[in-house]
Amino acid sequence: VELTGEEKAAVLALWDKVDEDKVGGEALGRLLVVYPWTQRFFDSFGDLSTAAAVMGNPKVKAHGKKVLHSFGDGVHHLDDLKVTFAQLSELHCDKLHVDPENFRLLGNVLVVVLAQQFGKAFTPELQAAYQKVVAGVANALAHKYH
């Protein structure tokens, strides 16, 4: 990811304030509500029939937490995202057959959730830096696709 030193510092400073457990469930839940076709990868999660069911689903929250912990690993390894996400890329490509476009969608949803959580502290400059980060993570996750 091409970030200036200032952008990296700002991304890391904000990330240290992120409640990964809460934000992860919120971001994944929103993805599943706004882009309902992504639900097909989560058949084992039970009731995803309404927005309220999705947002209150404990399996969605648990998986969102896991996703955001992995994203946090990426935030701390911005210069080596392909290596950081190599195993997850392989898993999502070869075993789960997830459309890599879903990584971009989730990244964009995450930026919205961060903006909601941090309000005015999530400046336009910080948003631009996070857009670069989520794009880099999405590209790293799509790396193993043929």
Curated annotation (Swiss-Prot):
Q: Which UniProt keywords apply?
A: Acetylation, Heme, Iron, Metal-binding, Methylation, Oxygen transport, Phosphoprotein, Transport
Q: Which Gene3D superfamilies match?
A: Globins (1.10.490.10)
Keyword Acetylation in annotation: yes
Give the Gene Ontology MF terms in alphabetical order.
haptoglobin binding; heme binding; hemoglobin alpha binding; metal ion binding; organic acid binding; oxygen binding; oxygen carrier activity; peroxidase activity
Q: Which InterPro entries match?
A: Globin, Globin-like_sf, Globin/Proto, Hemoglobin_b, Hemoglobin_oxygen_transport
Q: Where is it made, tissue-wise?
A: Red blood cells.
Q: Which residues carry this modification: N-acetylvaline?
A: V1
Q: Which sites bind heme b? A: H63, H92
Residues recorded with modification N6-succinyllysine: K17, K59
Annotated ranges, domain Globin: 2-146
Which SUPFAM superfamilies did the record assign? Answer: Globin-like
Where Phosphothreonine occurs along the chain? Answer: T123
Q: What GO CC terms are in its UniProt record?
A: blood microparticle; haptoglobin-hemoglobin complex; hemoglobin complex
GO BP term, example:
hydrogen peroxide catabolic process
Pfam families for the chain:
Globin (PF00042)
* Residues that bear Asymmetric dimethylarginine: R104
Q: Which residues carry this modification: Phosphoserine?
A: S44
Summarizing the function annotation, the protein's role is: Involved in oxygen transport from the lung to the various peripheral tissues.
Q: Which PANTHER family match?
A: HEMOGLOBIN FAMILY MEMBER, HEMOGLOBIN SUBUNIT BETA
Q: How does it assemble?
A: Heterotetramer of two alpha chains and two beta chains.
What family is this protein classified in?
Belongs to the globin family.
- Write the protein's name: Hemoglobin subunit beta-1
Organism in which the protein naturally occurs: Tapirus terrestris
